[in-house]
From Swiss-Prot:
Active site (catalytic residues): D248 (proton acceptor), K270 (proton donor)
Top-level taxon in the UniProt lineage: Bacteria
Organism: Pseudomonas syringae pv. syringae (strain B728a)
Keyword DNA damage: no
Binding site for NAD(+): E22, I23, P43, E44
Region (Precorrin-2 dehydrogenase /sirohydrochlorin ferrochelatase): 1-203
Record protein name field: Siroheme synthase
PANTHER family found in the cross-reference section: SIROHEME SYNTHASE, SIROHEME SYNTHASE-RELATED
Length: 464
């Protein structure tokens, strides 16, 4: 290990920055964020850096560098494009045994700046020892996506009770076990879900020795339209800590594979006129599993609150006092339209968009057809494949032109995506000609014409 990772408390200490340009500004921002007082030395200092110095309560010295500028400073930064000057600053600092960093010159440094993930008070530093800074930044970028910002709040919660826990458990092993339970259990879940007050209440109860609640928690997670890359970070995190996953037919296998490997998987999918598991039974199953103390992911295609019956499920959970979280997903209308190259709204073609269920009941649909034929709007029908002849017929009968552009998006956002475009008049015919199957989204409106020049994703299938 060439460099020993340390965290330096600079609050209120003076730091010398030699240089007044963009490089010096970048370093000075980090230093100022740590609460240091800046001393910047350069013949010219750019405006943003000047403001930063003033905000830190520091000083600007408008001249060339002098060895006496190091007086009273605990850290030295050489941030100029003058290599001999940078080398001189490094030598002077070393002679005084003051830590020095020379930008982009590891050989002249006694300290280097890592790539930083800031979730204060939790801070993560990644360094390549100056050998591959781009690689360190790429690793930092991955960590930024893996570690929610709420981890900082979780660390802050622990900090507020640290001394109290230390007094309760004088043995370090006991304290470690206590905090591991906190960070891996329901208290952390509440804090990460944005329920800080409840997390604090539970931590106080745990410190007081009260038995923890036996109830688990349910995560209602939107799996999006099919492409795993469209999952949210929170969805992925909760999927990977679930004990049980209840999933429906619209959840792609590639998404299901991202769940925790040893989680129990329960299929509760539904097909038209064939409910594998009645909705009421799904609701009861969620309650029963949570009462067993399990973390349950209810994984639903698209967004759980858009034609997903998510509202019914959490009503049941709320009635039984079961804690739950709702993680939105990209709904099929947004995802499939984007991957098909069809903007749902457009200044020249559509000023509004409607999401509509096309599900037939007793062979018909009970929809406000007169409203649906208004101009300058896009219609998106979910579950509309079986009822498509009725939908097209009713729209034309109520005044929508038979030549209105329309599209079918089958298995949108996946490698098996197929898109077929036509008009209201021939859309049902396209279904038969190309053997189109669910899940298929129906998009109706002038915006469909834009696909000819905006299509960008074709998947593995030909489109028409």
């Amino acid at each position: 290990m060439e460099f020993l990772p340390l965290f330096h408390n600079l609050r209120g200490s003076r730091v010398l920055v030699v240089g007044g340009g963009e490089i010096a500004l970048r370093k000075s921002r980090l230093i100022a964020d740590a609460g240091a007082v800046l001393r910047v030395v350069a013949p010219e200092i750019e405006a943003q850096l000047s403001e930063l110095v003033v905000q830190s309560g520091g000083e600007m010295i408008l001249r060339g560098y002098s060895e006496c500028d190091l007086d009273g400073c605990v850290l030295i930064i050489a941030a100029t494009d003058d290599e001999p000057l940078n080398a001189q600053v490094s030598r002077d600092a070393r002679l005084r045994c003051v830590p020095v960093n020379v930008v982009d010159a590891p050989a002249l440094c006694t300290v280097i700046f890592p790539a930083i993930v800031d979730r204060s008070p939790l801070v993560i530093a990644v360094s390549s020892g100056g050998d591959a800074p781009v690689l360190a930044r790429l690793i930092r970028a991955k960590l930024e996506t893996w570690i929610p910002s709420s981890y900082g709040q979780l660390a802050g919660l622990a900090a507020r009770f640290r001394n109290q826990v230390k007094g309760l458990f004088p043995n370090v092993q006991q304290r470690r076990a206590f905090w591991e339970e906190v960070f891996q259990g329901a208290i952390a879940d509440r804090q990460l879900a944005g329920q800080g007050a409840e997390a604090e209440r539970m931590l106080i109860a745990k410190i007081a020795g009260e038995p923890p609640p036996e109830t688990g928690e349910v995560y209602l997670v939107g799996a999006g339209p099919g492409d795993p890359d469209l999952l949210t970070f929170r969805a992925l995190r909760l999927m990977q800590q679930a004990d049980v996953v209840l999933y429906d037919r619209l959840v792609a296998p590639t998404i299901l594979d991202l769940c925790r490997r040893d989680a129990e998987r329960v299929y509760v999918g539904k097909r038209r006129a064939e409910h594998a598991v009645p909705q009421e039974q799904i609701n009861q199953q969620l309650v029963a599993l949570a009462k067993q103390g399990k973390r349950v992911v209810r994984l639903k295609g698209g967004d759980p609150f858009i034609f997903g019956r998510g509202g019914e499920e959490i009503e049941e959970l709320a009635a039984h006092g079961i804690p739950f979280q709702v993680v939105p997903g990209i709904t099929a209308a947004s995802g499939c339209a984007a991957y098909a190259g069809i903007p749902l709204t457009h200044r020249d073609h559509a000023q509004s968009v409607r999401f509509i269920t096309g599900h037939l009941k007793n062979g018909t649909t009970d929809l406000p057809w007169s409203d649906l034929v208004a101009p300058a709007q896009t219609l998106v029908f979910y579950m509309g494949l079986i009822g498509l002849p009725v939908i097209c017929e009713q729209l034309i009968r109520h005044g929508r032109s038979a030549d209105t552009p329309a599209a079918l998006v089958e298995q949108g956002t996946t490698v098996n995506q197929r898109v077929f475009t036509g008009t209201l008049a021939n859309l049902p015919q396209l279904v038969a000609e190309h053997d189109v199957h669910a899940p298929t989204l129906v998009i109706i409106g002038e915006v469909v014409k834009l696909r000819e020049k905006l299509a960008w994703f074709e998947g593995a299938q030909a489109t028409l």
